[in-house]
Amino acid sequence: MRNIDFDKFSEHSLVLRNYAKNFDTQLLEEIENIVKQNDFRHMKTPKGHQMSASMTNCGEYGWVSDKFGYRYEKTDPKTNQPWPKMPEIFRDLARSAADDSGYINFESDACLINRYQPKAAMALHQDKDEHDFTQPIVSISLGISVTFLFGGLTRTEKPVTKELHHGDLVVWGGPDRLRFHGVRPLKNNTHPLVGPLRFNLTLRKAN
């Protein structure tokens, strides 16, 4: 195993510090290319609440939320077109991080891209729309730092917090796969590559 700066929530849930930092420019260029094909939008929950982070997708499947529920779709319900192809750097980085975290041969088929502006947040939630919970989740942070909340298997358990910085990855799975997680509101700040924004790539095996 390479010399990696692990910051553990548990044996099954790891922060890999600076893991993506050497690839940041390439990752941001790929996000820009994806957005040209499928722009960011503020999705709504099934109850009609608009999410504060704007989102887009790439890969074989895209995660969507609307009045019909939370789910994965092979085509964008807004355009009826397939999602943009997932860049190889996304897939390769997620596979490498998963391997280094003990989850061997992870093959993601969906990448949700969140864009956070100041004050945008993500409430505690579980990722449970996937078909196979034996597959881990890989999350890549770019831009402004944020406080990540990592809770338990019930919403009432008090979450542990860690700051996530530009280039950090979080990998979790196994018995932690359905732990609640979220982020606190993004603070006003500036990053030299993305200004006042934070981007988050969440790679999953949806099908």
Predicted regions and their residues:
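Non-heme Fe(II) oxygenase metal-center motifs and adjacent flexible, charged/small-residue loops
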Residues: 1-207
